[in-house]
Amino acid sequence: TQITGSTIYLKNEFEQKTGSFKLRGAYYKIKTLSEEERKNGVVAASAGNHAQGVAYASALEKINCTIVMPKNASPAKVAATRGYGATVVLEGKNYDESWIKAQEIAKTTGATIIHAFDDSQIIAAQGVIGLEIIEQLSDVDEIYVPIGGGGLAAGILVAIKDKNPNVKVIGVESKSFPSMKKSLDSGKLETIEGGFTVADGISVRTPGEQTFEIIKDKIDEIVLVDDDEIINAMFLLMERSKSVVEPAGAAGLAYLVSKKPSPGKKVVPILCGGNIDMYLLGQIVAKGLATMGRMVKIFILLKDKPGALKE
């Protein structure tokens, strides 16, 4: 609050079981399956959080589950997904390539695809987050939502704009993967190449068709953040709130801290996930300390001879 000039209320979805909001949509979708669909099992593609949500929900419902994850997925997320009992298939360089493999598996096995975001039931379940915000903070002015495929933003938009159209909903994307913003700017779905970002959870090349239509009609604005801004927000959360939030989850707060767009307003950034690789976390802590002038690395070139350090 002191840093941004806004009154900030954090929506801690990273404290959900499996570490993100994704369990909401996954569990609701799986609960609606018919007996025949349950027998054939489910398959999903995900970089990590949706994978864990589907795997955990499938375990609760005793349904066979296959998850296709990119080959570069976080080892921690892969291990957690397997830990919930899912069969993990590593395929592709990104979500889109994993999705193609998931469709192939569905065709050959008869399994039901649980889409990460482009599904009306998934969208509806994520929208409950918006209802919870309105119920707990009826005079909220703005909500900041990380956007990858758009399921979370679409659900929250439907819920919030129905209850109070005056509440602004701002989507936040990585500058390296602005697929939804580019799609809105052109008026049609766009597929982008994307670049490197620490925020793997929102690195989606093509938004969903359903999510695009909802966001196009209802979103107030989409803004972009870079990795340095995200890392700064993560470090701030660790130090001030004692909260470990993954890069994608910190995107909304990153924009608030770096741009300070809403002085005097009551705002809610949704911290949508907390599943982060420990090696990456260590790098982020080191960079945060260095940026704040609290850690210095010194590199010294020494000759390979006895007494070189003394000299």
What are these regions (language model features)?
Residues 1-311:
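PLP-dependent amino-acid enzyme catalytic core
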